[in-house]
UniProtKB/Swiss-Prot annotation:
Disulfide bonds: none annotated. One of its GO terms (cellular component) is plasma membrane. PROSITE patterns: FTSK. Essential cell division protein that coordinates cell division and chromosome segregation. The N-terminus is involved in assembly of the cell-division machinery. The C-terminus functions as a DNA motor that moves dsDNA in an ATP-dependent manner towards the dif recombination site, which is located within the replication terminus region. Translocation stops specifically at Xer-dif sites, where FtsK interacts with the Xer recombinase, allowing activation of chromosome unlinking by recombination. FtsK orienting polar sequences (KOPS) guide the direction of DNA translocation. SMART domains: AAA, Ftsk_gamma. It comes from Rickettsia typhi (strain ATCC VR-144 / Wilmington). ATP binds at residues 402-407. The chain crosses the membrane at residues 16-36, 63-83, 93-113, 115-135, 144-164, 167-187. Belongs to the FtsK/SpoIIIE/SftA family. One of its GO terms (molecular function) is ATP binding. Residues 188-740 are cytoplasmic. This is DNA translocase FtsK. The keyword Phosphoprotein does not apply.
Length: 740
């Protein structure tokens, strides 16, 4: 019975940590209080040893110094690290730990073997160092041994080089602030220079209040974002009202995080839950053990390593049985990429809710390397997850009613509104349901009012395709590959007060037949990003599925470099809505809770979405096909109303009518140069029609030896000028010009 209680006490990880720390502290005391005159294996004396641990400490210190020298301090250091790992329940094989420590002792003592010290019997590396050093001088390079020692020490301490760099950065910040505070005390009129936690150097005047540590957004409408270019390239870019200047919305419009953080389960409760989970798995004949536990804001992930020979499909198929046995709402089981474990996700007893403001204030959102930040939420470890729409480059979202899909889309839109002004990012919002996106109607970021008719949605997508082609021609003229390179060249030209010119063909020389070129000055304005948001894809596919599918495919394949991106959502992820063509062109997808495993496989390619908890619980698959579980933030309607009203007050929307209007003429972009047709070619076509009394497109095509599109444009121009009549029911045209 006594042995049972002793074993139970020693199995506690906290007790193990204290024992290791006490052993490490005792060894440090033994080594520090070492005296060469104390009794040892090599000397005998009648005096009482001066070692603080007594006779045992004297013999132990003599043994360690003789064999390992100064590297004996690695042993207590290892005890401290192991104790920390036991305290935080980071388990690793004992044999691996002992093996690593022995390697560190041998390699370190070898490096110090050539150093002689008076208070140590042998060298600084001990007897082991001398023996191994003699061997290494013959067979192993000393430089390689130094590298090996460094690697072993890093593995032993289980630290990361990033952690070391963070410590050095914080230390340098502290010393810098200390020195600057000293000079500021002596010279109070100097500017206050403070290094903030977001690794940016903010310089503020002495008479100004320092900025907040987290928020970098403007708090007043009078503050104007620094943007040297305020004009747009036609037809996308339009002038904004001069009496109202667009500004980023203040962070104060969002609700503050509530101090109602749910206290997570204790370590003992998690271990008890893990034991219950192992018992349930054993009941179903699945053997294995749990190697790690990750507690998140909504669910807790148990990393289960099955026994050899256990099929993954067998464990995944037990998700419903595990949920029933543990009285849980649902259980999701999936393979963790890069590990030989299965992640078993169980919901927490109490769910933690968080708002959008908490994530927008994080350094991850303020990272300027993320071009189009989308706030998705927190991962299983509670860390913010900010995705970059520019790298996706398009996003497909699916989820049933009440799963949090609309709130997630609102969070994405708001995260873009807090980053870019209307000069930098524009939206085309398509909402056939006339409910979700109507709140954003009237904001200056829109290219057109929120589109609610499916027929106009097709026209808007066609306009996006034309705008994409126009941008590609503009980028090709100045020799860049994407919108970032184009804007960079434009900014450089504006700073240098020069214009960018390009040659265009205006016709042919009637005598030589060679093309005639003229130099045209390009519009020196930046190209804004364009984000097309489709809230319900199913309604559009019912009305005009083929046209929508073709346009979406064209944009998804080519619009990335032009700065045009798509966020497409649907609450019915069936194969007739998310077709194979659409699915192949949207590598980045988000699945909220769905009704069946079939819908989950349709959107993600695997099951698991049907096991989600709803209310913002989602599965995110990036363009690397790695699926991660994310918990979305909450955005209420009051916050959206405040943001949209603020944007409407600071700037008036300037719409582009061509986005939703069917063009009267459909000239090919190849045949049109600055809105005109080759007059010489047009006169030849009119002369042929007058003389031959034939006005068919094919006849003009053969006579002038031109393409079909160019011939069709010439005939349509004749119809507009009154030379030929519109085609009748048989397609024939009447020639209105008299005969020569």
């Amino acid at each position: 019975m006594i042995l049972y209680y002793i074993n139970k006490i020693l199995s506690n990880n906290k007790v193990q940590a204290f024992i290791l720390w006490i052993i490490g502290l005792a060894i440090v005391i033994v080594l520090i209080s070492y005296n060469i005159d104390d009794p040892s294996f090599n000397s005998v004396t009648t005096e009482y040893p001066s070692n603080l641990i007594g006779i045992a400490g004297a013999y132990l210190s003599d043994f360690l110094y003789q064999f390992f020298g100064l590297t004996a301090f690695i042993i207590p250091l290892a005890c401290f690290v192991w104790g920390r790992n036991c305290w935080h329940e980071r388990y690793r094989s004992v044999f691996i730990r002992i093996f690593v420590v022995l390697l560190a002792l041998i390699s370190s003592s070898t490096l110090l073997s050539k150093i002689k010290l008076e208070f140590i019997p042998a060298s600084a590396g001990g007897a082991v160092g001398i023996i191994v050093s003699n061997f290494c001088e013959r067979f192993i390079n000393q430089l390689y041994l130094l590298f090996q020692t460094f690697v072993i020490l890093v593995v032993l301490l289980e630290i990361k080089l990033i952690s070391i760099s963070n410590v050095l950065i914080k230390l340098s910040k502290f010393l810098t602030n200390l020195i600057l505070s000293f000079f500021n005390y002596i010279f109070p009129r100097l500017s206050l220079i403070t290094i903030q936690n977001n690794d940016k150097l903010n310089i503020t005047s002495f008479y100004q209040k320092p900025a907040s540590k987290k928020v970098t957004f403007t708090e007043e409408a009078s503050l104007i974002p620094t943007n040297p270019i305020k004009c747009f390239i036609k037809p996308v870019c339009t002038k904004i009202s001069q009496n109202k200047i667009a500004a980023l919305p203040p962070i104060s419009l969002l609700c503050d995080p509530k101090n109602n953080h749910v206290k997570g389960a204790s370590s003992s409760e998690l271990k008890q839950k893990a034991e219950e989970l192992l018992t349930v798995l054993n009941d179903f004949g699945v053997k294995g053990h749990i190697i790690n536990i990750n507690q998140g804001p909504v669910v807790t992930q148990y990393e289960f390593e099955p026994a050899a020979g256990t099929k993954t499909s067998r464990v995944v198929g037990l998700s419903d049985d595990i949920a029933r046995s543990l009285s849980a709402l649902s259980t999701r089981i999936a393979v963790i990429p890069g590990k030989n474990v299965l992640g078993i996700e169980l919901p927490n007893k109490q769910r933690e809710f968080f708002c959008l403001k908490e994530l927008i204030e994080t350094p991850e959102y303020q990272d300027k390397s993320i071009l189009l930040p989308l706030v998705l939420g927190k991962d299983l470890a509670g860390k913010p997850l900010i995705a970059d729409l520019a790298r996706m480059p398009h996003l497909l979202v699916a989820g049933t009613t009440g799963s949090g899909k609309s709130v997630g889309i609102n969070a994405m839109i708001v995260s873009l509104l807090y980053r870019y002004t209307p000069e930098e990012c524009r939206f085309i919002m398509i909402d056939p349901k006339m409910l979700e996106l109507s709140a954003y109607d009237g904001i200056p970021h829109l290219l057109t009012p929120v589109v609610t008719e499916p027929s106009k949605a097709v026209i808007a997508l066609k306009w996006a395709v034309k705008e994409m082609e126009n941008r590609y021609r503009m980028m090709s003229n100045i020799g860049v590959k994407n919108i970032a390179g184009y804007n960079e060249k434009i900014l450089e030209a504006v700073k240098e007060n020069r214009v960018i010119e390009r040659p265009i063909q205006t016709g042919f020389d009637p005598e030589t037949g060679k093309p005639i070129y003229e130099t045209v000055t390009m519009n020196m304005a930046k190209l804004p990003y364009i984000v097309v948001i489709v809230d319900e894809m199913a309604d559009l596919m019912l009305v005009s599925g083929k046209d929508i599918e073709m346009l979406i495919q064209r944009l998804a394949q080519m619009a990335r470099a032009a700065g045009i991106h798509i966020i497409m959502a649907t609450q019915r992820p069936s194969v007739d809505v998310i077709t194979g063509v659409i699915k192949a062109n949207f590598p980045s997808r988000i699945s909220f809770k769905v009704t069946s495993k079939i819908d989950s496989r349709t959107i993600l390619g695997e099951q698991g979405s049907e096991q989600l908890l709803g209310m913002g619980d989602m599965l995110f698959m990036g363009n690397t096909s790695k699926i991660s579980r994310v918990h979305g933030p909450f955005v209420n309607e009051a916050e959206i109303t405040k943001i949209t009203e603020y944007l409407k007050e600071t700037s008036m929307p300037v719409y582009i009518s061509e986005v939703t209007e069917q063009p009267e003429e459909n000239y090919s972009s190849i045949d049109i140069v600055d809105g005109s047709i080759d007059e010489v070619l047009y006169k030849k076509a009119v002369q042929i029609v007058r003389n031959e009394r034939k006005a068919s497109i094919s006849y003009i095509q053969r006579s002038l030896r031109i393409g079909y599109n160019k011939a069709a444009n010439l005939v349509e121009k004749m119809e507009k000028d009154g030379i030929v009549s519109p085609p009748n029911h048989t397609g024939k045209r009447e020639i209105l010009l008299p005969e020569m």
